[in-house]
Amino acid sequence: RPVGDLYEALAVEDIQRAADALHSVYDQLQGADGYVSLEVSPYLARDTEGTIAEAQRLWKGVGRDNLMVKVPGTREGVPAIRALISQGISINVTLLFSQKMYAEVLEAYISGLETFVAGGGDPKRIASVASFFISRIDVAVDNQLDGKIASVSSDQKAHLEALKGKVAIANAKLAYQHYLKVIGSDRWKKLTAKGAQVQRLLWAS
């Protein structure tokens, strides 16, 4: 039996047990919490159709309504997210670093919900989180700042030093402002009236 198949069988069984353990939380909070996530293969991060097919298989294989399938927030992942949400599959979007990609992912969630509702689906049973990474941005930016600091004047050095460790939080604040704008829109309020859950922002390290 291929190693990949063995891994998936073990992962599915493990996730089923975790989902069962948390299902009382899921029931008590009416689907607002109590989820377990299982990710599609990272090798499919640039493959829209492959991501959709694997997410569908994992969703069916686990067979628990408190599962979220992890899908990376790549350009190819965005249409997969839209398609999967429109099919009633809850999604945990991972590896979000930029405001632009976050905005695209949030739009994919909303348009997927609209399609699901238009087909007669109940949006209350769909949940999603957007995992927006913080510290990794500062690591990358601070390294670039260090390179610049080594080659500028003393006055400029002080200015650049003051920027270290701050870019990621500023980036996250702007993403949150976009989130607030979207959930305050008439478009979103129409979905809320039908019971839709917001796509929660998850601040990741």
What is the predicted function of each stretch?
Residues 30-36, 63-67, 87-89, 124-128, ...:
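Short, well-ordered coil/turn segments that N-cap beta-strands
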